[in-house]
Amino acid sequence: MSMFCYQCQEAAGGRGCTVKGVCGKTEDIAKTQDLIIYVVKGIAIYSSQVREIGLNTSEADKFIVESLFSTITNANFDAKALNARVQEGLKIRQSLKDAIIKAGGSYNSKENKSWTSKFLSVLGIKNDKDEKEIHDAAVWAANNPEDFKKKAETVGVLATENEDIRSLRELLTYGLKGMAAYLEHANNLGYDEDSIHAFMEKALVATLDDTLSADELTALVLECGKYGVDVMALLDKANTSTYGNPEITKVNIGVRNNPGILISGHDLKDMEELLKQTEGTGVDVYTHSEMLPANYYPAFKKYKHFVGNYGNAWWKQNEEFEAFNGPILMTTNCIVTPKASYKDRMYTTGVTGFEGVKHINASKDGKKDFSEIIEHAKRCSSPKEIEKGEIIGGFAHNQVLALAPQVVDAVKTGAIKRFFVMAGCDGRMKSRNYYTDFAKALPKDTVILTAGCAKYKYNKLDLGDINGIPRVLDAGQCNDSYSLAVIALKLKEVFELEDINELPISYNIAWYEQKAVIVLLALLHLGVKNIHLGPTLPAFLSPNVAKILVENFGIGTISSVDEDIKMFMN
């Protein structure tokens, strides 16, 4: 069977990639990622039971989160690293099973018959006619890449035959991948929440359960949105407690004459470590793409060698990385297949990877040594200037709420007629130019609320301001869509409305990968309706599942700029 992947917006033909991913991943990489997800589901079968009896699940929790994150679009293209992850997962699964067996002796008693039944069931032992055999995901075994390949052939997306069940299982899985990305960043800053891990396990196990109906899976998908809100709130707390609340900031987009390091991705802990280790070395640091919002945090402003932002959204990196001249550190997705001209200047860390690119691992205490990339930078020329000037951002919820009287007054007086949430992702399809044209064509009495790399379609346009309020308010990274929800809920309270949908806010969201999925599910959980997704609806939504979203939540797509603006403004 050939590969099949339809998790991102660029799925070939709007249906799915079957030969090679549009993202660049090979058939082998795609299938190994399928197998990683299968291994994670097997681990969840055991870890959910280990958690229930009060034993430590931290190793499994960490592995599940990192593994889900490693399979996000454009995160990891390193076959060796991915196969090693499969191997590690099987060892963790066995250790969980051993823990259950060990615990069985003390829990297996006349006073605890329910545990006895559960204990036997989770080990795959049928002790009465109602017991189910344990799923293959919890018991299959192999120890080499060739056997992994054979197994991967049988566990991909299409292994679920029913189109609607498959669609719901994948929608849930992609939501979990986005959730894992945000949880990983919070964990890196020392913040965690057991209930989120417990839900992830429950949801993963549910995707293996053939007895669950479409309605039951739909309920789980919506519950995933609840935990999506929780994980974004946790990450917001982690980021702001550690680095301060983002504040209105003018960000330099030009260059200086020193050698530099370009840091891309989302991990603020990596950003902090890099800034600390480069201080006093003569090496400047620039952000790229989704790392732009690091410029908004007070804690990073003390570093004089932190210059600003270089370049645009992830998909332009081939030309921009080439022009930068210095080394590039990829902390998370999105990686585009590197050109030979800069591949030897590229470094990955965390769950990211690309074959032939140097990887920087963390030590046991979580610290990372960036000395190699710093020394590399010293041997390089300074960045080539590709643009100059400034852009403004830092409008996360704390900053916007500080401006609440000004914003509320502008709404009450009619100076601001409507807000447009245009958060989400950018991508290489030409149809995404719609979002630039949409921003340009919006009436002058409207304000754009954005987060994520979708901002690059319009954050360098001169759209002016309304009574001193910029018409583009950038909250930050894609996870900072949470800020936009907080702002909306506060406005609902201020205007004494019963329903969040009564606010003069429209949602025209550009999606690309799985973090956008968890953001969407979170918004649905908060009761937001009539969200428009583009440039196309996800390929993984079957007609029936799409119908559910349309009928219950008013989900729509985009048409033309003029037609859509007319529709939104009426």
Curated annotation (Swiss-Prot):
Chief place where the protein resides: cytoplasm
Keyword Iron-sulfur among record annotations: yes
Binding locations of hybrid [4Fe-2O-2S] cluster: H266, E290, C334, C425, C453, C478, E513, K515
Alphabetical list of SUPFAM superfamilies matching this protein: Prismane protein-like
GO molecular function, one term: 4 iron, 4 sulfur cluster binding
GO cellular component, one term: cytoplasm
Cofactor note as given: Binds 1 [4Fe-4S] cluster.
Homology family: Belongs to the HCP family.
The protein, known as: Hydroxylamine reductase
Record organism: Clostridium botulinum (strain Okra / Type B1)
Classification of source organism: Bacteria, Bacillati, Bacillota, Clostridia, Eubacteriales
Gene, per the UniProt record: hcp
